[in-house]
UniProtKB/Swiss-Prot annotation:
Organism whose genome encodes this protein: Pediococcus pentosaceus (strain ATCC 25745 / CCUG 21536 / LMG 10740 / 183-1w)
UniProt entry tagged with the keyword Amino-acid biosynthesis: no
Catalytic reaction list: alpha-D-glucosamine 1-phosphate = D-glucosamine 6-phosphate
Annotated catalytic residues: S104
GO cellular component: cytosol
Keyword line: Isomerase, Magnesium, Metal-binding, Phosphoprotein
Protein name: Phosphoglucosamine mutase
Cofactor(s), by name: Mg(2+)
GO molecular function, one term: phosphoglucosamine mutase activity
GO biological process terms held by the UniProt record: carbohydrate metabolic process; peptidoglycan biosynthetic process; UDP-N-acetylglucosamine biosynthetic process
Role: Catalyzes the conversion of glucosamine-6-phosphate to glucosamine-1-phosphate.
Claim: Isomerase is one of the keywords in the record: yes
NCBIfam families in UniProt: glmM (TIGR01455)
Length: 452
């Protein structure tokens, strides 16, 4: 289902250019109406609203809230809380919906609006389509109460504190004895990390915890973990964790300064849970972009995997369908469904630290089971991406390469979700091998269906 406004993670755009306050107002009206129309008749619906630290968040928040109020919704303004914090608090407060204003790991000029249902899950494609119909309607026929039916705003600053208290009780013991380094990306976790990791009795050092509205994700956080890697070594920490702007991702760094990505975090936590009989069906849910090294490590330890398309919402859908409790993405969106309904960076960090403490092993030792295979990705512009995948010559070269790999590599050819591109990716034991495999497939794609 191709939507006009909603992408894989809400509505995104350049703040005040494509994501305007006018659009935020309309999203408040349309989204608020769709998500609360089934609220009990005897009470006004309630919606939680939060944002990350980017400067445009204030502009968009006020516009969005105005839209919500105009259709008679009571708004609880939480200030700055993480995306997974909103997902948790919607359920705790028994609210009708939650809205997070963020562009996650994107640069400061971008922003977005992300909705959660009363169950704490991101919206289905069908609900998003219903909102879009109202956004594009010739006439706005939604309710416009003029007095008694209008909504009002209540500040809910304790929301963030309730969320951090929840995080701290997701492990049965504290983390005393661990020395950790934390990169908060100058984002939504900045004002919470010191309190949480002090309460858990860690020794900790922090970086990128001083947001100024403009420095969110700027060379720091989960998409730029190199700075944290140096910081860990410099401080002599046992490990480091980096979050992104809205706190739904976590990338770790071991005591030697090596990056421990989402694949390795899933493996480490999955193995720990599996050994204790707490990993449902001994299965981890991943996306097609997870590295072959993860699958080999899972297999070697009698664990299974299920693959979905790219996007943490699809991981969650698969987990719900079959009752799995651990899944995620290489990028650091890790979902612990026993605790929260979406990827949660601080929750992931706490679970990973707990494994390190309980096993008594260094993070580098725990991550060593996963050998990351060299990967190469090339985008090729084509006339028709759907027809390209049905081309016999392309099918033949993919099959030939896969046969040559003989289980020691993999090929993934998939269409771009937004452009007429084929994404050609391969993994193999050496850089030379993976380069040669990809180049051969690219040559056939270009000669058969490529566009100069």
């Amino acid at each position: 289902m191709k939507l006009k406004y909603f992408g894989t993670d809400g509505v995104r755009g350049i703040a005040n250019e494509t994501l305007t306050p006018e659009l935020a107002f309309q999203l408040g009206r349309a989204g608020g109406y769709v998500l609360t129309k089934h609220a009990k008749d005897d009470e006004q619906p309630r919606v939680l609203v939060s944002r990350d630290t980017r400067i445009s968040g204030q502009l968009l928040k006020h516009a969005l809230i105005s839209g919500l109020l105009s259709v008679g919704i009571e708004v609880m303004d939480m200030g700055i809380v993480t995306t997974p914090g909103v997902a948790y608090l919607v359920r705790k407060q028994e609210a009708d919906a939650g809205v997070m204003i963020t562009a996650s790991h994107n640069p400061v000029q971008d922003n977005g609006i992300k909705f959660f249902g009363s169950d704490g899950y991101k919206l289905s494609d069908e609900l998003e389509a219903e909102i879009e119909v109202l956004l594009d309607a010739d006439k706005d026929n939604l309710p416009r109460p003029s007095s008694t039916g209008l909504g009002s705003v209540t500040d809910y600053p304790e929301g963030g504190l309730n969320y951090t208290a929840f995080l701290e009780q997701t492990i049965p013991d504290d983390l005393e004895g661990l020395h950790i380094a934390i990169d908060a990306a100058n984002g939504a976790t900045s004002s919470y990390v010191s309190q949480i990791f002090a309460d858990l009795n860690t020794e900790f050092d922090t970086m990128a915890t001083n947001p100024d509205g403009l420095n969110i994700n700027a060379g720091v956080g989960s998409t730029h973990p190199e700075g944290l890697a140096k910081f860990v070594v410099e401080k002599g920490a046992d490990m480091g964790v980096a979050f992104d702007g809205d706190g739904d991702r976590c990338i770790a760094v071991d005591e030697l300064g090596n990056i421990v990505d989402g694949d390795k975090i899933m493996y480490i936590c999955g193995k720990f849970l599996s050994e204790r009989g707490r990993l449902k069906d001994d299965t981890v849910v991943t996306t097609v972009m997870s590295n072959l090294g993860l699958y080999k490590a899972l297999e070697a330890n009698d664990m299974h995997s299920v693959k979905t398309q790219v996007g943490d919402r699809y991981v969650v859908e698969e987990m719900l369908k079959d009752g799995y409790n651990l899944g995620g993405e290489q990028s650091g969106h890790i979902v612990f469904l026993d605790h929260n309904t979406t990827g949660d960076g601080m929750l992931t960090a706490i679970q990973l630290m707990y494994v390190v403490k309980q096993t008594g092993k260094k993070l580098s030792e725990l991550a060593a089971d996963v050998t990351t295979y060299p990967q190469k990705l090339v985008n090729v512009r084509v006339q028709d991406k759907k027809l390209a995948l049905e081309n016999q010559a392309i099918k033949d070269i993919i099959e030939k390469v896969e046969n040559e790999m003989n289980g020691e590599g993999r090929v993934l050819v998939r269409p771009s979700g937004t452009e007429d591109l084929l994404r050609i990716m391969a993994e193999a034991p050496t850089k030379e091998a993976v380069g040669q495999y990809v180049d051969r497939i690219v040559a056939v794609v270009q000669s058969e269906v490529g566009v100069d």
